[in-house]
């Protein structure tokens, strides 16, 4: 049965398949307890890793874990989009079942159900720990799992099943050199503060997400985080790009992704900043489905990126955003204008100050003008 499952998974497009025991993950449980303040947010929503540390809390009859891995860096990513959107999101990993990755998962789940196999997937199982237990990868100091031939650009899906598939029970290990701290040095916010330790609330990616999708994600991004977000508007790859273990993968000559080449023509910071509902529904939502449930959060992130660019050419676009009906968009446009500075930015802020009735936006304008 295990071989039949493996062959089917490979046939429908997964790149690695492994099996692991369904025993609890005591090291993860201990880490979550030790760092409860950093990880309080994972006790809600789809993640609930505090429950998922024991797969049998998800499927009481669980006997094995199936771990599926897909290499999401098989095609190149346009330079216009890298540095703005994380590669995992550019690869459309988390789209619904009517798109390729979601369809692949549905096919696999249906395959198991047709054979009378019960499965559990929610709350989310600890994918990286499961992949390590199955012998499919090793940990990096940036907390990612590294898979031979893929680096850390590996999409992992774990399912608990009620059949014994002869799974592995390997210890989680790392193959990073003891003296390497490239990922830690590359993290501008200090989210990666020591090897294998991350405070997610300081992570750029975490702060670009939309509240509601992820518990405790702030609507208002702290000022000192904004300044360090650079051009990132959704996700962040800095710790992966800096890693020597990813160097070979990042330097590979890969075929282009035709879909992304088309999206790169329209998904620009200025287009996102001042997008209307039609642009959001036709250009953004099919591309970033489910990641950003309201356009104002992506407009917020685009404003931050434009402010961090320091480019005077962004000032007219940000001045226009000061007229947006959404308070959040106006507030972050004001912050961005203050970040860029100059006479034109100041004139736009002063013009809006006399007409603004939101205390939050006025606060941002006053700070920007000082």
Segment roles from a protein language model:
Residues 270, 280-285, 311-323, 342-354:
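Amphipathic alpha-helical scaffolding segments comprising HEAT/armadillo-like alpha-solenoid repeats
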Residues 14, 182-205, 228-257:
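Iron-sulfur cluster-binding cysteine motifs and their immediate structural context
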Residues 1-5, 15-17, 323, 347, ...:
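Long C-terminal interaction/binding lobes of large macromolecular proteins
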Residues 146-171, 197-225, 278-281:
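Short, charged low-complexity linear segments at domain edges
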